[in-house]
């Protein structure tokens, strides 16, 4: 998969057509999940469940933002064994499946939820695994044209029209800090040293969806280590925060691995020096 292209092409849609996804494409997704989909924490047991539109009435009472569920022809449920890293692992895996669906020209939308047991009861699921992530998928309704910046490198920007809603996000210079939190001095020089490759990884990490587009995280670069730092956010609960972290880690890892080899994250490392109160070191990657 060309992760850089899929990350730039993915979009969250909020209205789906009734057209169903062909069974062949769903079969490809299942095969990808079983054979290829990366696991952040491989020892956590997971299961992928594909639901059709008949599941919508059951989900409407148990999932969606403030119980508002986006109707779709299909839904993905990622089930997980209970684990302290179940949420972050689910975000990592499910976002990879979202990018696979993007490669198959299928649209998606992450769904929020708060109660796994309520969803399992509504769907009559008897598995001991818990609901860890939900994504609606299908073919999105066409929307008004919006300009999208397709940024190929720090100096090459392609402006194109795209059929999607526009949601502003923090850019690389907002997310990445050098040496100490809020310091930007030396950031551009570091990016230049890696000949745009590191910048592309951070750019990919600036694009993922997050709950209400809050992006309650950032990166702190110290020496040859990159820390993913979680910020307190009154609007984001623990489950959505964990999913958000997994998603952003997948985006960074998928692009960085194209030039740095396999990216291995250490979860919950000791806090780096100078991290302000209210911030938590969620993971670290040693280059």
Where are these regions (language model features)?
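Acidic, surface-exposed loops and disordered segments
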Residues: 1-287
């Amino acid at each position: 998969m060309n992760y850089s292209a899929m990350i730039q092409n993915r979009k969250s849609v909020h209205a789906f057509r009734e057209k169903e996804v062909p069974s062949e494409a769903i079969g490809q997704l299942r095969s990808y999940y079983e054979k290829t989909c990366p696991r952040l924490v491989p020892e956590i047991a997971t299961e992928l469940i594909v639901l059709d539109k008949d599941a919508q009435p059951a989900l409407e009472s148990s999932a969606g933002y403030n119980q508002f569920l986006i109707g779709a022809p299909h839904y993905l449920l990622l089930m997980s064994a209970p684990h302290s890293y179940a949420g972050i692992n689910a975000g990592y895996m499910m976002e990879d499946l979202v990018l696979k669906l993007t490669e198959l020209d299928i649209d998606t939308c992450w769904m929020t939820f708060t109660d796994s047991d309520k969803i399992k009861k509504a769907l009559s699921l008897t598995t001991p695994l818990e609901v860890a992530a939900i994504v609606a998928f299908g073919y999105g309704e066409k929307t008004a044209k919006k300009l999208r910046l397709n940024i190929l490198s720090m100096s090459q920007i392609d402006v194109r029209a795209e059929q999607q809603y526009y949601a502003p996000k923090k850019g690389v210079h907002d997310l990445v800090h050098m040496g100490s939190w809020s310091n930007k001095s030396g950031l551009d020089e570091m990016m230049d040293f890696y000949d745009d490759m590191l910048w592309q990884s951070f750019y990919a990490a600036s694009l993922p969806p997050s709950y209400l587009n809050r992006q309650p995280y950032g990166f702190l670069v110290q020496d040859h280590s990159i820390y993913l730092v979680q910020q307190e956010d009154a609007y984001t609960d623990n489950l959505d925060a964990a999913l958000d972290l997994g998603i952003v880690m997948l985006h960074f890892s998928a692009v960085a691995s194209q030039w740095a080899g396999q990216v291995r994250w250490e979860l919950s490392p000791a806090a780096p020096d100078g991290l302000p109160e209210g911030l938590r070191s969620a993971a670290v990657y040693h280059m």
